[in-house]
Amino acid sequence: MSVTQTPFAPLRNEYASLPEPGNTSQIQYNVAIGYLRAFVTVLVLAHHAALAYHPFAPAPLTSLIAEPRLWPAFPVVDAQRWSGFSVLVGFNDTFFMSLMFFLSGLFVWKSLQRKGSGAFLRNRMFRLGLPFVVAAACLAPLAYYPAYLQTGHQGLAGFWLQWISLGNWPAGPAWFVWVLLAFDCIAAVLFMLIPKWGDVLGRLLSRPSRRPITFFAILVFASAAAYIPMALVFNPFRWTVFGPFFFQTSRILHYLVYFLIGIGIGAASVERGLLARDGKLARGWPLWAGGALFAFGLAGAVFIVAISAQNSPYLWGTLGGFTFTLSCAASSMAFLALFVRFAKPRKIFDSLRENAYGIYLIHYAIVSWLQYALLKAQLSAIEKAFIVFTGTLALSWIAIAAIRRVPAVARLI
């Protein structure tokens, strides 16, 4: 196992099956959460489409094995840049992975109770483990081949020689899938050892879930306790890697906190409390939206000061870590409020929701090839990113909708 400084682009969710709706509020809730997961998938596509044109993207590489290895996060680097993409990428990076771990946890407890640990893990191995193997073995080399081409080299043989000599092989966005599978394994083992642990967690969160401010405070301080010590010990951009398994070292416990809190909210009753359509969170969406913007601005200001500060690195590291967790929680609460309050069934959004997992799995290869194809185009960074984003969304959506017509594929993704 090794540790790398690669600032990998963070990514997304399990897309577990939603429970069968039993009443109108449950139907509306399922629509809201399903649409929110699909929306974050779209944010992931926009995030990756913009990275080639990020103002601080690294210089084009000369070899896949050259150090530092920044190409896993930036497979293609364009000469065209736009400063606004630093805001988009920074905003996404503060919250969307954490929110997706929270959403992934919502239905875990009911699934464990219904299936038991064995059947639950078999289902997760099928829905998460198998796609990860395919993504790491097939889709990742396809996505990173343009990085090799940008070095000026040609030919699959040369690419393969450099690829197998790496020692650690990035799986692209699929890193999220294996981490989620690991978290599911933790939940299943706990269920075998302590069968009521989710119910206890649900009872602890039941009252705070009806008071969004209280729940927000719990989320901030629990995640800060998990994140800040790790960020002080490890560089916040550091990734631990072994083989095809990557995870962001300082955030792994932070993500686990969001996942476990999601389990607790799901155990407490997903259609009531925090995520009720007529609840306090949904009714207060304007305040949460404004608070999210303020918290992100505060986190950005602290980050700028912290990276230029010459003194008190632990103080600024602590402040930076706290404002990160503050912004993360505020943005997550804001998007939950907006979707629970306003999401209504639409056929096109239903299609996006149904195909979102597959879109997530295959989009990275499409992004990198479109970025590579546009390298010599006489277009601005904004124009290129827009073409890459819309092209990736359309192509991946069409492709997944087509292959999901095969029943076995539809059961998998």
Predicted stretch roles:
Residues 2-413:
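Alpha-helical transmembrane segments and their immediate juxtamembrane cytosolic regions
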